Amino acid sequence: MSSPIKKVLFIEPRAPRPHIFSRVAIPRIGPVLLGTILERQGLEVKVIIEEIAAPDYRSLDFKPDLVCISSITSTAPRAYELGDFYRRQGLPVVMGGAHPSFVVRETLDHADYVICGEGDEALPELVAALNSGGDLGQIPNLAFLAGETLRQNPWRPFLEDLDSLPIPNYEVVHGWNARRGRRFVSIATSRGCPFNCRFCAVIKLFGRKYRYNSVDRVMEEIRQNGAKAHHIFFCDDNFTADRERIKKLCQRILQEKIKIEWSAQVRVEAAKDEEMMILMARAGCYCVFVGLESINPATLKLYNKSQTVEGIKDCVVNFHRHGIRVHGMFVFGSEEDHYQVIRDTVKFSRDLDLDSLQYLILTPIPGTPVYQELEAQNRIFCHDWSHYDGHHAVFQPRRLTPYELQFETIRAMKKFYSWTSVLKRLIARDWFYVKMKAGGRIQMWQSRWGKSNHVQQLKERLFSRVQQLRQWLPGSNYVPRVGIPADIWKLGPWESSHRDFLLRFLRHLGVEVVQETVVDKTENGPLSQVQAEIARLQEKADLILLPFWQGLEEAKQKIKDAHQQITHETVARLLDLEFSRESFYNACMELGLCFQKRLRRIRRIYFQTLAEVGAEI
């Protein structure tokens, strides 16, 4: 380092676009806590939470020696932009948070150092090493480039004594004093989670074991930060994990007569404890955020969720009975979800009278099991991190096209945040939720969410693929006879149910299916037999469909090459379509759009055929 580090700037980048909580700026606790730790060590610190107050960095009067940027996946592009800005000025940049922890190499294109996982100890050690010329290789959780070589140090054991950390000082937040009367503070009372939800990276970041602050320590933080705030958000991933501890905390709040309004994230099971709910309500609990996830039992099982649909109903009813509002969160797009699941969820939500909710799209966040699986299956088609906010389809679902998943989720949000729902809250004089629901509705209208570039791209992605397929159709789009070589099923792991389904599906689309088989099986294997069958189908079909199972590229090319040699003037053209367990529905929609124009009708035919076959597809 050319000069010692005396002033450190922390930045929490803004979300890429407005969201339901845009008007309720709740700072993430990480930058504030880390800033407080460095402040206690004698450094001058400023924390910028861009959703609270975003300055013009070119004219910012605070001139840092080190810049620390925290990022989740959806804010990564903004974090990269800020990192590049300060590096051009010759300042060292550190990045941390959930996204950099799992996308280390990419992040180091925009930062000098990455702190993976918890930074409570790693960041002070890094600052000390930079000031003294210490060995960076000895700092656990740190990653950096040594020339072109990535150096990624092992992670340290998780910090057990959370009480040893200082109480976050929100006075270091830029623009904080201007928010008197509108202050929302975050308080963390625990870290870790034993529940292995497949779309969540908490276990990798904070461990499987719960680690708690003592009730005394939490009370001290409430007195210091919460009493001066309009609202406290307990940002634990599962606030009520230890119910007896929460009962003690609520009792202490009541005993000390602290008047606060607060909210927290809880699991469905929390509503089974009557005593705890009574104490929470009396101690000022305004709202709970509950991961309801799905009303599809198969999806709940897939997400590793133990809750049931009846349990979800009881949860909402029980919290409402104690005057506690419920913000529900559903996630669409699992391997078991289809369009009707989404529509049934909307009806379920409205019947349940949830106060507010988010219909989220399953998002493969780096570091999660879902990301690893979808990436390995090559099903992620969008790597624009700004779209990884739970509101954009970025992968190919199994039982929906990406466009359908996006369209149905937008439709669901519009249904829930309707003007009728706003009027209902207005009649009840529930002013906070009047603002929230009206704001949500206006926000969707202002942002033209349903006509966003991403939605249009998904639509174009589907229909451009269909246009590519249609170019193989003869003359007009109407194809009365489609030929399928009978032995093509032997080229892949086609089960009889899949084969039966596809043939029925084509017939329901109004297509006559012609199959040709080679009588003389002395041909050299199924590939040669298929080539012979294609030759025989030339004069019997207008189009020859080759349904290939995924991974048969070599066989596909050999057949197409052989076909070109069969005839000079192609009587029937070859249409090859790739199928797999994960893409079967999508392939059927593409195939259907070759013969029918309305996606809704094709979808109805698909599910009608599924009912006829009576087998898992």
What label would you give each PLM region?
Residues 61-67, 229, 285, 539-543:
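Short acidic/histidine-rich motifs immediately flanking catalytic phosphotransfer sites
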Residues 2-4, 8-9, 14-17, 136-139, ...:
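N-terminal [4Fe-4S]-dependent radical SAM core
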